[in-house]
Design a protein with these regions (language model features):
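Elongated, amphipathic alpha-helical interaction scaffolds
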Residues: 1-242
Length: 242
């Protein structure tokens, strides 16, 4: 147990996040989010196969959800801080994902072309709008190259989707769980400006339950959600002063 500046005891075993619990443990929620992002209409959650990696050393805490559906390998992350290195993180993550898939097939050295699922990397962002004011932004790995490799020679992207209030309304309308999650996080961020973090989280949870926002989820996992938020938001506060 670690004592923070706000005199909050943070349990460091909680490296999972609310985003991952919502979308990484419920195929129905993940499918709804996929449909909203891709303008599809899949109805059977069993069409979706989770591929989320565990214990990824370059990820500080688990805000990632990966799954396979319709020959597309999706990686979704939530970020409340702007990070220009997301394309590199996604590149490394996908290397591990494809390594697992190729090991399963054991055809890497075949004379025939080995077909792989199409990658689709999305970062859901609800941090400061000073860093991302537009609804979407595509981050490119080539921006990190120390020398110019030539247009189109190699590229890897991360698509940032802004889920702050008033942004990407069509996605929010199509995936109500994402909308409710964004409301919940926004409440915590707003309340922590005027009270201690633990009080802000408790108030946000109570209000969301009263307003029927993630009610069943919060009632069922209230203690765990509070612990995850304490860890995530406390680490976010520390990162902001670095």
């Amino acid at each position: 147990m670690t004592k923070t500046n706000d005199d909050i005891h943070v349990n460091k075993k909680y490296k999972d996040t609310v985003f991952r619990k919502l979308f990484g443990e419920n195929k129905g929620n993940a499918l709804s989010l996929y449909n909203a992002v891709n303008h599809t209409s899949y109805t059977d959650p069993d069409d979706l196969e989770y591929t989320t990696l565990e214990d990824v050393i370059y990820m500080k805490y688990k805000n990632d959800v990966s799954f396979l559906i319709d020959k597309t390998l999706s990686l979704y992350e939530h970020q409340s801080s702007y990070n220009p290195n997301m394309p590199l993180r996604g590149f490394l993550y996908y290397a591990d994902l494809y390594r697992k898939l190729i090991h399963r097939s054991e055809r890497l050295y075949s004379k025939h072309l080995l077909k792989i699922p199409r990658p689709h990397y999305i970062v859901f962002y609800n941090g400061s709008e000073k860093d991302l004011a537009e609804e979407r932004r595509i981050l490119r790995l080539s921006d990190a190259f120390e020398t110019d490799t030539g247009a189109g020679e190699y590229e890897w992207t991360a698509t940032m989707i802004n889920i702050n209030s008033g942004k990407n309304q069509s996605i929010m309308d199509s995936c109500h769980v994402l909308y409710e999650y964004a409301v919940f996080v926004a409440k915590i961020k707003r309340y922590r400006d005027s009270m201690e973090l633990k009080e802000a989280i408790d108030l946000a949870v109570r209000e969301c339950i009263e307003e029927n926002i993630l009610r069943d989820f919060l009632e069922q996992h209230r203690r765990e959600v509070c612990d995850m938020c304490l860890t995530e938001f406390d680490e976010k506060k520390y990162e902001d002063v670095l």
